[in-house]
Amino acid sequence: MILVLDFGSQYTQLIARRLRESGIYTEIVPFFESIENIQKKAPKGLILSGGPASVYAKDAYKPNGKIFDLNVPILGICYGMQYLVDFFGGVVVGANEQEFGKAVLEITQDSVIFEGVKIKSLVWMSHMDKVIELPKGFTTLAKSPNSPHCAIENGKIFGLQFHPEVIQSEEGGKILENFALLVCGCEKTWGMQHFAQREIARLKEKIANAKVLCAVSGGVDSTVVATLLYRAIKDNLIAVFVDHGLLRKNEKERVQAMFKDLQIPLNTIDAKGIFLSKLKGVSEPELKRKIIGETFIEVFEKEAKKHHLKGKIEFLAQGTLYPDVIESVSVKGPSKVIKTHHNVGGLPEWMDFKLIEPLRELFKDEARLLGKELGVSQDFLMRHPFPGPGLAVRILGEVSESKIKRLQEADFIFIEELKKANLYDKVWQAFCVLLNVNSVGVMGDNRTYENAICLRAVNASDGMTASFSFLEHSFLEKVSNRITNEVSGINRVVYDITSKPPGTIEWE
């Protein structure tokens, strides 16, 4: 196992993801993690991440110096390398020419960490400081146009001024793999087949004959959690799907068919009437979210009570992923409250369940791979993200049954055309937004005054930032024609060309 000490870099999670993609199990902890906890994890190597600070600043992040007594290889990346240089007596200063973006790395000295790596390659830089003098015993391995010491080595200690974890670094994955396999002696034992076998055995032992309640939203995470649990405990899983009437077209039927194929019993609650009555007259987005969240809890509680009376439920399953775990203990210090799934946050006190989070070690892409391993269809696993409050936050203004129907039909056409054109898997997320704006139109010889709808499609890697998708005009024209001809009540279609920032992906 490789352990990454996080100094606050926006790229830290990528380090773990790249190594895991190579089959090497990797965890992330904050830079201030105690030596005792690090020793318990027994890592074969440490990686010190990048970070936004300068090592010579008074408030610079610095780990416990005893990490050097652990006798394991250490790799410092960007800030991590500068920390190593500073700690061992070298000199780091503010750079006259800062490096951001792509640069050419030139290897000047053979090293195990560069085995099989091209002499010259593109790497990704993101630093304002640079090393001008190495500590005693260190050797320069590579340089870039503005960094004379772009890679350094002293025995089992290595430093890289660039970011090998970023996809723009052409040989970055190979360099990280060399560190883990050739320097640290790790083995490629991490993969979803192994994880599934291990986790099913662990869940069987932990849960035994107890019952587990699992809220199923129809999304990837909750579906994979339910599938994994069912493999472990069979009918002791109580999977509950609440249909709040704000789902995509045919969503309920699709989820039911999926669970039938997986042979997992699913308790479906038709709560459309309850949700729509509570949303009547409400147009403020945050209030809509609040009402949906509270109503979900009411409906979920009622269903849970029903099952609780039949036989005590001991566990509540949640689709927490590894990024949620990392965020709960960030470099800014431990968080008091671990981020909860929107569907189960704020449950009443009588539901004194033990929490079970089978996916808490996994990134989103790994959860998808696990789902594939467990037999969940690829088509289902690769669906675009969908907000917890559903179509309520894609209908601007008050929600009504007729507006939901209108939006469902338009959205269905947009997604169907994206799939026909082989574009669905090329955009990160696509959907329609029903605007609370009417416009004048002409249908035949008649004047119309109907809804306008907005198409939204974005490209992103994680949703933190996004750019609008450049869809061909002919494609947009086809979608527009279909929507205005096939969906009653819509006479105008617009396309959103706002990126994030300044906009958000969803409108509400």
Curated annotation (Swiss-Prot):
One Gene Ontology cellular component = cytosol
Q: What is its EC number?
A: 6.3.5.2
In this chain, ATP is annotated as bound at 217-223
Q: Catalysed reaction per UniProt?
A: XMP + L-glutamine + ATP + H2O = GMP + L-glutamate + AMP + diphosphate + 2 H(+)
Alphabetically list the UniProt keywords. ATP-binding, Glutamine amidotransferase, GMP biosynthesis, Ligase, Nucleotide-binding, Purine biosynthesis
* Presence of keyword Zinc: no
The family database entries (InterPro entries) matched by this protein are listed as: Class_I_gatase-like, GATASE, GMP_synth_C, GMP_synth_GATase, GMP_synthase, GMPS_ATP_PPase_dom, NAD/GMP_synthase, Rossmann-like_a/b/a_fold
Identify the residues that the record assigns to the GMPS ATP-PPase domain, covering every copy. Answer: 190-383
The record's active-site residues are 78 (nucleophile), 163, 165
Q: Which is an annotated GO molecular function term of this record?
A: ATP binding
Residues annotated as domain Glutamine amidotransferase type-1: 1-189
Role = Catalyzes the synthesis of GMP from XMP.
Q: Whom does it interact with, and what assembly results?
A: Homodimer.
HAMAP family documented for this protein: GMP_synthase
Name the UniProt record assigns to this protein: GMP synthase [glutamine-hydrolyzing]
